[in-house]
From Swiss-Prot:
The keyword Iron applies. This is Cytochrome b. The chain crosses the membrane at residues 33-53, 77-98, 113-133, 178-198, 226-246, 288-308, 320-340, 347-367. Binds 2 heme b groups non-covalently. It comes from Tragulus napu. Its cofactor is heme b.
Amino acid sequence: MINIRKSHPLMKIVNNAFIDLPAPSNISSWWNFGSLLGICLILQILTGLFLAMHYTSDTSTAFSSVTHICRDVNYGWIIRYMHANGASMFFICLYMHVGRGLYYGSYTFLETWNIGVILLLTVMATAFMGYVLPWGQMSFWGATVITNLLSAIPYIGTELVEWIWGGFSVDKATLTRFFAFHFILPFVITALALVHLLFLHETGSNNPTGIPSDADKIPFHPYYTIKDVLGALVLMLVLLLLVLFSPDLLGDPDNYTPANPLNTPPHIKPEWYFLFAYAILRSIPNKLGGVLALIASILILQLMPLLHTSKQRSMMFRPISQCLFWLLAADLLTLTWIGGQPVEHPYVVIGQLASILYFSIILVLMPVAGVIENKMLKW
């Protein structure tokens, strides 16, 4: 009799995706982040669901309802901080996952990569809207500043902003719709993640060498299931250390002050995971130019397959490209630091130089390095 795992219509899908899936024998811990992102997503949906049971999306009670969750709801504080810091872990895993894709040339799986970029944008939109919900000072002013960027669009900008706000300023209508979108988008992300997996399983995983591994495959279970469990334990350890010892480490103290449209905080800044993009936005003095640079900083990922000039897929055997990759990583950390600093000398100049370097590395230096490495290898 055939194994039920291989014959049952539902079990068969799970089996082909997580049990009997042929996987390369040499994939490193950098391949753990996909499963960690799945765990983060499930954690965020569950904690978010319990938060939504007690949260009210009205401007007069939103801030109080979050305080009520932390003070009066059984274990509400841990649910709230798991959700807030879970978002930080989500983005750490996301950026590591994207970095892995860039380093090992995984972007040559076009459909998987493109769905991945759409996923990144959707997660960023969801996180932004979630940050508005507690209705603190930084929630309100962050929402005002970021939505206002759309007014830079010629002709329709102002109407578009007022349409998104549902009025002439960020108010009740804005908060209610942001809550609605923040609730629905994680399920859209889940669907997109399944499509992402679907396309990945059409081709199979890449590996650190970038060389096809069809000749040497091993079953996903038990080899990579146990490896993913180890990754999940490390993720949960870091998350719990954050939540239980310094839950507000990555947050902004201004968000413990209720939103006040009449009082602007001295430094408006988003959560830490958006600071690099915020720094790029601020580095251009023109509003429309800044908005375009902001969009380009993420959408540039879609160009990666077109900018690949090397005859090798991975950077494993390409020292010049490796140096440029780590320079890019350092540049992103610099931009993250600058995004959290006030707009004054020398931060403005550092931000502008870091922004120029960011686009130069991706658009110019990396493709040139690929050509040089081909020549060095007499290809």
